[in-house]
């Protein structure tokens, strides 16, 4: 919800019309979920020095995560699908949306 809200605020400030607001809201929802799944994956697979926290801390705390429910590969696949859907939501926009496209790719590809 935080990423979606940030994107919506930017759209409002930028003067988005109704259709653009819908597209940007969809982008924010999709990339927000992709970010969370990727964050859950990083908690399992990431480098502790880069993360700044102990790997596996979510698991140790008993937190419910996408990888715990669906497995690592399915989680990677789902994060990528969500990223692609987020990028598709930007298809009506020109290069003004390139920073959003770059952010979407970074959020998901940081696991690799």
Whereabouts are the PLM-identified features?
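All-alpha prenyltransferase/terpene-synthase fold signal
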Residues: 1-112
């Amino acid at each position: 919800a935080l990423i979606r809200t940030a994107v919506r605020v930017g759209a409002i400030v930028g003067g988005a019309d109704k259709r653009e607001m819908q597209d940007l809201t969809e982008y924010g929802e999709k990339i927000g979920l992709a970010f969370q799944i990727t964050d859950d994956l990083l908690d399992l697979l990431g480098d502790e020095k880069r993360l700044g926290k102990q790997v596996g801390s979510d698991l140790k705390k008993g937190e419910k995560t996408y990888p715990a429910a669906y497995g690592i590969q399915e989680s990677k696949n789902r994060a990528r699908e969500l990223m692609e859907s987020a990028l598709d939501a930007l298809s009506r926009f020109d290069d003004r949306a390139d920073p959003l496209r770059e952010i979407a790719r970074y959020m998901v590809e940081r696991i690799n």
